[in-house]
Amino acid sequence: MINIKKGLDLPIEGAPQQVIHDGSTVKRVAVLGEEFIGMRPTMHVRVDDQVKKGQVLFEDKKNPGVLFTAPASGTVKEINRGAKRVLQSVVIEVNGSEQITFGTFSDAELSSLDREKAKEVLIQSGQWTALRARPFSKVAAVDANPSSIFVTAIDTNPLAADPAVIIAENVQAFEAGLAVVSRLTDGKVFVCKQAGSQVPSSSIAQVEVHEFGGVHPAGLVGTHIHHLDAVSISKQVWHIGYQDVIAFGHLFLTGEIYTDRVISLAGPRVKNPRLVKTQLGASLDDLVAGELEDGDNRVISGSVLSGSISNGVHAFLGRYHVQVSVLLEGREKELFGWIAPGSDKFSVTRTFISHLAPSRLFKMTTSTGGSKRAMVPIGSYERVMPLDILPTLLLRDLLSRDVDSAMSLGALELDEEDLALCTFVCPGKYEYGAALRDCLTTIEKEG
């Protein structure tokens, strides 16, 4: 077992009951274009077109062969674009149950499945987009050969669902999905799980199960990759979430695209925090209707640390998200708040007297607790960074856009979520995820 000691389990109220319930009926679903880094679409549909579940909506010009398909049957109601014609979302009004189907495979056939056949089914069904590559965190290229593939069956994000609860409902599909994933590489498949959790193992020779314990970010794939098979500019690995492995298994066992998702609907503003069953790309306006306390709430697709704000054309469940978090908008100003005792505030530096009650949970809001200021190296980043890098130096280089130095300090290993805790504890209120993405984009462009 690998035990992570540096990090932080956010003491936030609103943790979900680890029991699966049916979610609200969803009337609209969407594919969010900006989730797919560097993607440039060639559209296959127009507004008012009728589409079947699994029908191609668009293809990626920058990653030829990667298809994006409809998560439900219905009518294309909106194709939203932003600045420079960037695709924001393709919105479908759900109606009917028509779908495109594929061939079925027995367990014996899966064990000897041809790699090209596995790729063909995943690509044509649109499920290939579940596979992402490090470095750069883009959808995996169809002609690439990864050193290894990581299956993330652990989640230490604040307010997250327990993967073991969800996998227990889909054991056969999960095992079949692992068989499919193992056909995509000559290297190892690392299944990373919480220490002591009941995630099933596999008899496949390529599959290795590794346990991680300790505090967040013990559950992030960046942590797993760093410890088990680190990447470089010339070496890539792929990774996939446990619910997408289940979807792979359902696809090959039944021939039907599986878009069900079990997510955590939680946070201080949720009346009844719990696990709910919904579908990929679900409208969060529909999903949270009647679920929230009155007030000015911020709905977040994903973790409170690294998720995306859900509003307008982006008010849908993200492709890679398995939780919806809700916080109160922290718009209030507090006079001389920095000298108050802070019995109801949390600080990693023990600035407030609340640290005398270490087990207390807080009704956190979106407030940053102050305005932007200088980056102050007081050891906060080192407290929450478990990877073998020098965080203060790396973060400084990211802000100053010193790409060469940032690359030498380990920027290629990281994704925005890996720096989310650094952003949270930063006295200067900097967004390090955005700075990292700018750096990675520059590195990729310059080769």
UniProtKB/Swiss-Prot annotation:
Disulfide bonds: none
Keyword Lipid metabolism: no
Signal peptide positions on this chain: none
Listed GO biological process terms: sodium ion transport
Top-tier EC class: translocase
Catalytic activity: a ubiquinone + n Na(+)(in) + NADH + H(+) = a ubiquinol + n Na(+)(out) + NAD(+)
Enzyme Commission designation: 7.2.1.1
InterPro entries, sorted: NqrA (IPR008703), NQRA_2nd (IPR056148), NqrA_C_domain (IPR022615), NQRA_N (IPR056147)
Protein keywords: Ion transport, NAD, Sodium, Sodium transport, Translocase, Transport, Ubiquinone
GO molecular function, one term: oxidoreductase activity, acting on NAD(P)H, quinone or similar compound as acceptor
Keyword presence, Ribonucleoprotein: no
Superkingdom field: Bacteria
Alphabetical list of HAMAP family matching this protein: NqrA (MF_00425)
Role summary: NQR complex catalyzes the reduction of ubiquinone-1 to ubiquinol by two successive reactions, coupled with the transport of Na(+) ions from the cytoplasm to the periplasm. NqrA to NqrE are probably involved in the second step, the conversion of ubisemiquinone to ubiquinol.
Subunit note: Composed of six subunits; NqrA, NqrB, NqrC, NqrD, NqrE and NqrF.
Classification via PANTHER family: NA(+)-TRANSLOCATING NADH-QUINONE REDUCTASE SUBUNIT A
Family per similarity comment: Belongs to the NqrA family.
Protein name, UniProt field: Na(+)-translocating NADH-quinone reductase subunit A
Gene: nqrA
